[in-house]
From Swiss-Prot:
Region of interest (Disordered), residue spans: 178-203
Compartment annotation: Periplasm
Subunit structure comment from the entry: Monomer.
Name recorded for this polypeptide: Outer-membrane lipoprotein carrier protein
Organism whose genome encodes this protein: Salmonella typhi
Annotated keywords: Chaperone, Periplasm, Protein transport, Signal, Transport
Length: 203
């Protein structure tokens, strides 16, 4: 009986691993259908009790695997740009820009996961699929991300995604007007404006 229980446990583990692998493959396959796009987005952040913390909006340009421009326009402007090698974060309000190597950037943020769509990133998560919804739970529990959900259609269109942090703060993003196709190369370059303080962490 004990051997049977162990065998059943092992079988369940194998089946679960297969399901997670299939879900990861399906998610990557769907995202791969669109190599570049532009979309507008709205953001809503709530705390652990569900109370609203912040609402915002902006524009997003992506050219996979490593080019993207995340431009938050409200409530405060901020820009996150990758030129394929360097990741720039610019805050106009404080007039500061930070430069880091993209290869050193964390892969456990929802936006980075979507923008890069790399198999090595998805392997860090247990993924469950329910129709167009994919729920990701980190295999390691030492990060700040508790759960990540993305809704992406069979045609590769991303409708929404959300992230829940360890303190249950939830950030939800609704994407609208996704336009698939070539993106102007200038969207993936960044030149710090004159007078801006630069924190270069690439050294």
């Amino acid at each position: 009986m004990k051997k049977m229980a162990i065998a059943c446990a092992l079988l369940s583990s194998v089946v679960a691993s297969s399901v997670w692998a299939d879900a990861a493959s399906s998610l990557k396959s769907r995202l791969d259908k669109v190599s570049s796009f532009h979309a507008t987005f709205t953001q809503k952040v709530t705390d652990g009790s569900g109370a609203a913390v912040q609402e915002g909006q902006g524009d997003l340009w992506v050219k996979r695997p490593n080019l993207f421009n995340w431009h938050m326009t409200q409530p405060d402007e901020s820009i996150l740009v990758s030129d394929g090698k360097t990741l720039w974060f610019y805050n106009p309000f404080v007039e500061q820009a930070t430069a880091t190597w993209l290869k050193d950037a964390t892969g456990n943020t929802p936006f980075m996961l979507i923008a890069r769509n790399q198999a090595s990133d998805w392997q860090q998560y247990n993924i469950k699929q329910d129709g167009d919804n994919f729920v990701l739970t980190p295999k390691a529990s030492n990060g700040n991300l508790k759960q990540f959900t993305i809704n992406v259609g069979r045609d590769g269109t991303i409708h929404q995604f959300s992230a829940v942090e360890q303190d249950d703060q939830r950030s939800a993003y609704q994407l609208k007007s996704q336009q698939n196709g070539a993106v102007e190369p200038s969207k993936f370059t960044f030149t710090p404006p004159q007078g801006v303080t630069i924190d270069d962490q690439r050294k």
